[in-house]
Amino acid sequence: MNQITKISQITSGDVAEYLRLPEVTADDINTLNNLIGISKAFISNYTGRTLEELDNYQDFVIVSLVLCQDMWDNRTLYVDSSNLNNVIETILGMHSVNLLPQETS
């Protein structure tokens, strides 16, 4: 697998390699691209970080790959947040800003 340092660098090929898919069809590529987008949106919503800010945290790369793997294995196009992997939940929690009270003027 290529050295990926930013979540925006993840491609369908990277996810296919992470999933150890022997052959990848055009439909698979489309599905993998959707899974990447869904994983990014989930990470952004969970942490309260913008999609642009996600690139500042290299550990979000593995989070995205694991989320894609879970969705691929379960054939779902959503992240089941009630059954998140503990490591993934910990990494996301370390970078969450939406749990902090907002300053008011």
Model-found features: residue ranges?
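Divalent metal-cofactor coordination and adjacent catalytic microenvironments
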Residues: 1-105
